[in-house]
Amino acid sequence: MFSSESRPTVKLPDKWAKKRCFFQLLSSLSTTLKKLCSSSSHCSGFHLIIRPFQRFFGLEKMYRSTKGASKARRDQINAEIRSLKELLPISDADKARLSYLHIMSLACIYTRKSVFFSQAAAGHGMSGSLLSLPELSDLLHTLPGFLLVLTSEGKLLYLSDNVAEHLGHSMVDLVAQSDSVYDIIDPVDHFIMRGNLVPITTPDTDRLFRCRFSTSKFVRRQGSGNKQAIVRARCLPPPYHASPYWTSNPVWVCFCSPLEASMPQLSTSRNPLPTPPAEQSFLLSCFQSQHSRDMRIHTVQDSVSVYLGYDIETLRSRSWYSLIHPRDLSHASAQHCTLLHNGGERQVEMVVQVEAADHSWIWLYIVLQLETGEYPINSHNYVISESEAWSVRQQLHSEQNQLALLYQESRQSSDPLSSPDQVFTPSSSGLSSQSFDFSFITSGRSSSEELPGTSAPSSMTFDPLEGEEIDPQSHGGGHQMWRSAMTIAPEHLSNINLSTVPQSQVAPPPLPPFKAPPKRQRSEEFICTPPYTPRLSGGSFIFNDETLRPSDHSKSAKMRQSITSATNIGPAQPCRKRLYETLPPTPDSPGSDECILMALPEIRGPLYVDVPHLPFHAPPEGLLTPEASPTKKPCLSFFPREDETERERMEISLLAQYISTLAEGFCHNHPQGASAPPHHANSSLAHIDVLMFEEKAVDDIPLPNLPSPSPVPPSPYSSVPSYSQCRSSPVQEEAAVTLIGVNHLCSVQLTHCNRMTEGGLQDGERPDEDMEMMSSQRSSEAPALTPALPCAQSLLEELVTMEPVFGAAVPMTPADRQQDELYQLPHQGGPQMFYQDGTGDHMF
């Protein structure tokens, strides 16, 4: 092509340099040919010319296109996926609907199952099968649920074919685009599932919990349809010589029984129901029964004879409550009332113990469903163990709290826990105060947990048959209950745990000044409110610095009306609230003259109100106990002023000086050695008479007008050494304490002087000078009752004035006014206040 003269002379050091040089020549040549062939239809001739040169110099791979190779690779992958689809053990109809991603997910599921069970069978030396595949399929379809096998991380190994009968869709539909169990479970229950699939050290351990499965065809659209099921999970032992994957991810087999309404299937001779013993069966042992509205048994499955030992005719027309454990009667009655309530739940759940024919106690997880007909209540009774009962009951309680927090209204259930400390602690055997205590305000506690000395019924009962409330206070039952509660011995009050006492038994007596409503509302309106922050009408709010203005009589009366109206919710409300949601108005409330309805979070421990330990003239107004009972008198000032504090400090210091002076007098008059003379009965009686006479004389003398102390001549009998000067007989001490009282400081000094005088009298044996000595002693010692201190007299007057208040506050115990979860101020009397109607107090 090129002549020898025009051929360029290029020095090429090596082979690759020649190739690069020739490539440059080809590039320039290709540019020229493109320009020449741009208008020609034979453009493909360029490739025919250039490719031999590329092949000769090894440069053809630089111009190879990868588009065809990628397509060929994808075709090979798709062919393998189609081959894999044909190996899946599913129907042809399901195979036709599978996508490539779905096929790979199902292939992973069946591969895990085959690897795990083949290794397990090889490790245990098992060969063959007890049942054929058709028999196994028929057995699965007769089960009241479906089987689920998965790893601890949620990867599915197996899902039984009868899942379509319970969830409405086949495994192919439910496992769309994933092989994880969390794609077919409601997101709310993901935490519950993860918590129950935690690896454990002990295999063959059963766990029972409730879970909601998705019934939507498109699994990613959660919430379109869910079905609740009770799940029993058991951890399987790992295969022999298993790989690290199976060691770190234990396999769980779960039996899921949907909690759906269905008529009880009565067993017949042609269709017997399998009833294996509950302790030997992994499947949930269940029997169904039908009841009337009063829970009398109408029909029951024959399997009840296996689980409880009763005959069907024995249980017919028998009350369901006669089988319930006494501890669980209140909880069962509460759920029964909730089911029968108009507009309430159509299904309730409970965990109770029932008595078997051999007088043993069996744990049952019961699902009551309300239907129509003569016998509308359908009961599903699942036989469970004690540990499973603890788990399910705890889950039920936590779900109720979550509903109250998320939806701002609680479930319409009347079973508050008696104490946060007693939440679902399983008992080993017998009656226990820590074993599932559910106190119900309408029915009280069971007979096994009554307080000693309190046998009165609760203040409000509910009759499920009549559907109305019964108020026993109209017959005097409330006052009788209050009197019986007040007659408890003081030594028993210190041993009583107030958290186990029904709130209706520790509530204060009815308030006489208020006019009773014409008809009480539902019993739930009398459930106690949680510990409440005190509202002070003249001080400062305890949890912030907001100053409250003192309210006049009209505002305080309006507040009291709003507080009383908080316990009477009209029937015009759109929904029923829990009683603890009804709170009196707080300083931060939007309005001060009406009740605010709100939901409070669950308090898992005692709530303490931090109150300064300072003297008060009266208890604060609005300091509500858990029964929402107001205190006696309004408080003018919660925190005392500085001048009052200084005055109190001065009085305390003066009192301390006076006590020290009195103690020095005792020390100076103490004898060094003497023998106690014999005491006579007549001397004790004479001493009591003298003390009564002296007490009357002291009370007649006005303390503010006492003369100043004057020197007193020493008594001739005081110098005689006698042991009775410092110690008197027990009869004399008891009489002195009984007649004079322990709260008068002057009586202490008076008693000391009387002992000195009596000791001298007995030692000298001068009965003829008895009256003369007593009169002189009284005239000489009466002015010395008040020390030479400026403010001691006012303090003594205040102590004498407040003595009845101290005596009235002594029997005040936490059992009759408040619970131990709320520490209140001591009840002290203050200045008497009178209202326009002439009464001393509107609160009591």
UniProtKB/Swiss-Prot annotation:
Gene Ontology molecular function: any one: protein dimerization activity
The keyword Glycoprotein belongs to this UniProt entry's keyword annotation: no
SUPFAM superfamilies in the cross-refs: PYP-like sensor domain (PAS domain) (SSF55785)
Chief localisation class: nucleus
Gene Ontology CC entries for this record: nucleus; postsynapse
Keyword flag Disulfide bond: no
Composition skew (Pro residues), residue ranges: 704-716
Task of the protein: Transcription factor expressed in neurons of the brain that regulates the excitatory-inhibitory balance within neural circuits and is required for contextual memory in the hippocampus. Plays a key role in the structural and functional plasticity of neurons.
Protein name per its UniProtKB record: Neuronal PAS domain-containing protein 4B
Species the sequence originates in: Danio rerio (Zebrafish)
Taxonomy of the source species: Eukaryota, Metazoa, Chordata, Craniata, Vertebrata
Name of the gene encoding the protein in the UniProt record: npas4b
